Design a protein with these regions (language model features):
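Conserved phosphotransfer microenvironments
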Residues: 477-496, 503-504, 511-519
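Short coil/linker segments at helix-helix boundaries
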Residues: 74, 79, 83-92, 236-280, ...
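Short hydrophobic/Thr-rich beta-strand motif most characteristic of the beta2 strand and flanking loop
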Residues: 453-461, 468
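Conserved acidic segment of CheY-like receiver
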Residues: 428-450, 462, 478
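Output/docking surface of receiver
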Residues: 510-548
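Structural detector for internal amphipathic alpha-helices that build alpha-solenoid repeat scaffolds
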Residues: 46-49, 62, 75-79, 103-115, ...
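Alpha-solenoid HEAT/Armadillo-like helical repeat scaffolds in large eukaryotic proteins
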Residues: 122-130, 154-162, 184-192, 218-222, ...
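TPR/TPR-like alpha-solenoid helical repeat scaffolds
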Residues: 70-90, 214-232, 293-318, 334, ...
Length: 698
């Protein structure tokens, strides 16, 4: 997600390279708006070099206002040293936005050119039929370099040719395309004649890419083995494994056979890995209709895509292709419901296994609607979720069980109400990802953040962390160790910064003593929100995360946390089962309704307290009732909760006085609710007389 007005800057040394753009950006490159945008861009770069970021941003905004076309941007990018754009991206602010906009527009032209059927057909004709080897070789190289996977449909048929030279030339061209050809080749098996099939299998075996193993097993008659391989790949795709989802930032096509022809279906990149996982699950299900994991994966991927769409910025959702994908995702609920309670429980378990708490929570939300009354044992996925280290999964499991409200106690049912109360108290709680290959330190930091009230999860490798971060784009902050064993911290920071799903997250680096040493200048390029010292208690990390995430109300993290709090409160209010001790939720509900809570959050918590409150809640409820600045609806709800808390009990003097005062409030609703609350308690005759006398209606 792009953030306008960032204060982060690249060092002056790095910006020196940007001055080369003053020469490279010729008037012919930016022809739109009669060269005005060209001049604005050059001026902006010059000002950026001088450290005048505010003035530079004004020029960059003028460039965006000129609304460059795809072709304008493509011409510019082709004629410019890419390092210029890299430094603009690092500079932040509107320099970063201009660079992202131009690169994105240019990329759209690149993609269209890579699919150009006329260009592909001409090169294939040369690669297959030219008499000279060097001509065939050059054409094959151009197919690989400029068209990649999109050349496969035109080449694959030649693998079944009766002419040995034709087959050899096709194999040569496809071999040069290499791993980019794997997905369309694997999808094509079964089309064409037997010779084409066998040559396709041999070619895929020669390339040796794991993504084709399931298709090869299927082609060789091993249905059971193929189904298992498809599911193994589905899990890797779902997790966003960087070594599996190849060309993740370039290619977003799902290959299938339709009416005997190999066709590509383009998808937005934010769902690409999930769509690959879903296709594998459908392939597995076609081989084994009884495969539970396949049905679970189909339900899970749909929910994961819905979550990912919800985490996009408004700007991203306005994109035509992304908006269309969002519209299509409206049908996910029907598919998820169709797998039934058992299928959704499997999907919830799978989401937890794959460390996608957001998708698992989305699945859990659908389970009560299809609940079939089955017995709940220790092996139930929701019961197992109650002890998950991921708070999202714990909270989702508790909320779902409350909504189900089983007729009898079940394993760990005594934990449910308190966990739900904790979920209610999690209003405006932020999501934090910890990346550290030191497993012990990662666990310590995760635990400390969770104890401090954050939702924290940990990854024990840089690549795993990037996959988790991109899975939903829902993390408010990423804490990464300065020392990783698989990739460098700079690779992690750069990838987080340039991906639209993660660019908005605050980035915090953990380093010994909080000192980045000689590398500080390099770190400064990535717009860090802070540096924290490593320690056994992780206090420094927690404090730095708190500082980085101190932001105003209304942001996406607060909205998500408030939604969770309201869902938990509503589940507690609606629960109706002897399996739960709902008063265990009281502490969390009181925290949810406390100072600083948004009105809808407080109202939901107070409505739940009207069902579960006891005398221990008097002090907090009294404070809400007595605060005149609280909205009348909140004070009324607090009075109703107080009525429950006082039922059959003697109110404290402070509570009695507060309710008596509230009976004289200007708002009739508050007066009425306060009267009902004071009447629910055990009053002395003297108190009863005082109420009647002091609040007499003349």
């Amino acid at each position: 997600m792009i953030r306008i007005g960032s204060n982060s800057r690249a060092p002056r040394r790095a910006l020196c390279l940007v001055t080369t753009a003053l020469v490279v950006f010729g008037g012919s490159a930016l022809a739109w708006a009669d060269g005005a945008a060209d001049e604005a861009l050059k001026a902006g770069i010059g000002l950026l070099k001088q450290g005048k970021s505010k003035e530079a941003d004004e020029k960059f905004r003028a460039v965006l206002a000129a609304d460059p076309s795809n072709q304008d941007a493509y011409s510019l990018v082709k004629d410019t040293d890419y390092r210029v754009f890299l430094e603009m991206l690092k500079a932040g602010g509107d320099a970063e936005q201009v660079a992202k906009r131009l690169l994105n527009l240019s990329n759209q032209v690149e993609v269209e050119k890579s699919k150009d059927p006329a260009a592909i057909a001409a090169l294939i004709d040369t690669a297959i039929n030219a008499k000279e080897l060097d001509q065939r070789d050059m054409a094959a190289r151009k197919l690989a370099g400029s068209h990649g996977q999109y050349a496969v449909p035109g080449l694959v048929g030649y693998l079944g040719s009766n002419d040995v030279d034709t087959r050899a030339n096709a194999i040569l061209a496809l071999t040069k395309i290499g791993s980019d050809a794997v997905l369309p080749l694997a999808a094509s098996i079964g089309t064409g004649n037997e010779m084409q099939k066998q040559n396709t299998i041999k070619l895929l075996q020669r390339i040796g890419d794991e993504r084709s193993e399931a298709a090869i097993a299927k082609a060789m008659g091993d249905k059971a083995g193929a189904a298992q391989k498809y599911m193994a790949m589905a899990k890797k795709y779902f997790h966003g494994d960087q070594m599996t989802v190849k060309a993740f930032d370039r290619s977003f096509s799902i290959w299938t056979v339709k009416d005997g022809a190999l066709v590509a279906r383009d998808v937005p990149r934010f769902v690409y890995n999930y769509e690959l996982a879903e296709q594998c699950a459908y392939d597995a299900l076609a081989l084994d209709p009884s495969m539970k994991d396949a049905r679970a994966m189909i339900a899970l991927t749909g929910c994961a895509e819905q979550v990912a769409f919800g985490n996009l910025s408004d700007e991203a959702r306005a994109n035509e292709g992304i908006a269309a994908q969002g519209k299509a995702l409206e049908g996910v609920g029907a598919i998820a419901g169709a797998v039934g309670a058992g299928g959704l429980l499997d999907a919830f378990r799978l989401g937890a296994e794959l460390k996608n708490g957001d998708a698992a929570a989305k699945v859990a939300d659908a389970i009560p609607g299809v609940w079939d009354g089955r017995a709940i044992g220790e092996d139930n996925a929701l019961v197992q979720g109650l002890t998950s280290e991921d708070n999202k999964i714990r909270y989702a499991a508790a909320i779902a069980l409350l909504r189900i409200s089983p007729a009898a106690a079940f394993p760990k049912s005594n934990m449910v109400a308190q966990i739900a109360g904790d979920a209610a108290a999690s209003r405006a709680v932020r999501q934090v990802l910890v990346i550290d290959t030191d497993t012990k330190n990662a666990m310590n930091v995760q635990r400390a953040l969770n104890q401090a009230g954050f939702h924290a999860v940990a990854a024990n490798a840089g690549t795993e962390g990037l996959s988790m971060a991109k899975a939903t784009g829902g993390f408010d902050a990423v804490v990464v160790s300065s020392k990783l064993s698989d990739i460098t911290v700079f690779q992690v920071l750069a990838d987080l910064g340039r991906d639209f799903r993660t660019s908005g997250a605050k980035k915090i680096v953990m380093a010994a003593g909080g000192d980045l040493g000689a590398s500080k200048a390099e770190y400064d390029k990535f717009g860090l929100s802070g540096v924290a010292p490593t320690s056994t208690d992780s206090v420094g990390v927690v404090n730095m995360v708190k500082e980085a995430l101190a932001s105003p109300a209304g942001d996406s993290g607060r909205v998500h946390a408030n939604w969770l709090s309201i869902a938990a409160s509503n589940a507690i209010a609606g629960a109706n089962s002897p399996a739960f001790n709902l008063r265990d939720a009281q502490k969390g509900l009181l925290a949810a309704a406390g100072p600083g809570a948004d009105p809808d959050v407080a109202l939901a918590a107070l409505n739940a307290l009207a069902k579960v409150a006891n005398g221990d809640a008097q002090s907090e409820l009294r404070g809400i009732i007595s605060t005149a600045s609280n909205p009348a609806a909140i004070r009324v709800a607090a009075c109703r909760a107080m009525a429950t808390a006082l039922r059959g009990q003697t109110p404290s003097k402070e509570t009695y006085d507060a309710l008596l005062d509230a009976m004289g409030d200007a708002d009739v609703g508050v007066r009425t609710a306060a009267g009902a609350a004071i009447g629910s308690g055990k009053l002395t005759p003297e108190q009863q007389a005082e109420v009647m006398t002091k609040r007499r209606v003349d």
